[in-house]
Amino acid sequence: MLLEKLISQFDSLWPPADKEEWDKPGLMLGTPAQEVRKVLLSVDVTREVIEEAISTGSQLIVSHHPMFMRGAFELAETGIKGANAALAIRHGVAVFSAHTNADFQTGGVTQSLATKLGLTKLTALESTSSHVVMGEVDEVSLLDFARLVGKKLPAVAQGVKVAGDPSRMISKVAVLAGSGDSYLPMVAQSSADLYITSDLRHHPAQDFSEQSAITGGPALMDIAHWAAEWVWLDSAKAQLENLIAQVEFVVSEINTDPWTFAVMQ
């Protein structure tokens, strides 16, 4: 199947118009006229992922994170972005990314995470433009739910970090896959007992937790960014297989979390 026809199908699943203003998803590398028979799905485009695409005979990588997330001002092979781009191009591997335009769709990244964690009765948290999903679980202690989350997600160095009383009982959970501290003020005003997201910074998390301790607001759970978004790959694979029968879709086996180990103190 021609890449340009695949892109048309991708855009029907993940409309480019739904991306955040700052985001740059879409075709990163490749030519629309090239033939694609096998697609590798991944969270990131790293050297290992490109090598996996080559070894599995994949002509296209569909990643969640754009290959040039922070922009690129040169692609010399002395730098990792240039070296990775050159490796992919030399082996005829194209790269396409679906980022924020995939986050908030039905079956998208955040919904996939909420479903994986066992949340039911999913709705959009008001005031967050549908970015944060609210759901319910049978009443459970914060500690036991954190343990459940740890079992549901792939193992990573950071584990599952939690701020709150371990014995607190929770039933309403707000979720945002990826970096979510910009939504802390909105979640604080909600009926959630717990907010699960990634990349929480020291000061926003500290202020939120102190306020919650006074007001009875939500507890916090910080899960690894890669682990939170990895669960979407199986959902994306199923959607693509239902839409496109002529192409084989496989999920990457590479863990692209940047951290390799932690020393517990």
What is each PLM-predicted segment?
Residues 1-265:
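Hydrophobic structural segments
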